[in-house]
Design a protein with these regions (language model features):
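Class I S-adenosyl-L-methionine-dependent methyltransferase catalytic core
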Residues: 1-222
């Protein structure tokens, strides 16, 4: 709903369908069947729309190889997970394909709440495994904690921006994206960081457009 008028506002899937020039195909993935049912009712029997009610990582690892450079295919992938749920393998696969540009909401809130705790013994094995899956390896254990101990003997976590910069570097150096501009922090009403909005591509033109979008978002008070 629009906060000012109270009128319904189109969600991002329906807005994507209205983009001109239009994409040849649209692939929407969500584990929430109810959301997909609403979208299915809105799009009807359009042959260019594909809906997947499953884990997005599994679906993307099937879709990405079909976007072939040799067939002059290109794709824009928007990753907006519920939390720290994107598998690093998906990002690596997209980078290797060289045909896919990505916007990605990286959940710093989830990391701070569940993984980067002062007392690391309180981090469950499940949460530890989620971080390993999202980061791709165990390097985060060295990169995201300072070497200085607190008064209570715990290693202090680095600040949010340092976490974001470390992930930016991984997208470039490890995953293999050529162009990874500095991300933008997405904040709540109390100005606390929720996500970092990343763009990753093999295309400098796409990166320039992303930088302009990020700059505009920052200037209007994001």
């Amino acid at each position: 709903m629009d906060r000012a008028t109270g009128e319904p506002v189109e969600g991002s899937p329906l807005r994507a369908l209205d983009i001109r020039p239009r994409f040849e195909e649209f692939h929407f993935i969500d584990v929430d069947r109810g959301k997909l049912d609403v979208l299915r009712a809105a799009v009807g029997d359009r042959a260019d729309v594909f809906l997947y009610n499953e884990d997005a990582n599994e679906a993307l690892l099937r879709i990405i190889p079909t976007v072939k450079y040799s067939e002059f295919k290109r794709a824009l992938c928007v990753l907006d997970p519920y939390g720290l749920d994107v598998d690093w393998k998906v990002l690596v696969a997209a980078a290797k394909q060289k045909t896919i540009e990505i916007f990605f909401n990286f959940s710093i809130m989830d990391i701070n709440r569940n993984i980067l705790r002062h007392d690391r013994d309180t981090v469950s094995q499940k949460q530890y495994n989620r971080m390993m899956r999202a980061w791709g390896d165990g390097s985060w254990e060295q990169e995201l904690f300072s070497r200085d101990e607190s008064l209570f003997g715990y290693l202090e976590k680095v600040d949010n921006w340092t976490v974001a910069k470390a992930f930016q570097k991984r997208l470039h150096d490890v995953a293999g994206f050529t162009c990874v501009p500095e991300p933008v922090a997405m904040k709540n009403s109390k100005k606390a960081d929720l996500y970092y909005w990343f763009f990753a591509s093999q295309n400098s033109t796409g990166a320039k457009i992303a930088k302009d979008i990020f700059k505009h978002y920052t200037q209007v008070g994001g």
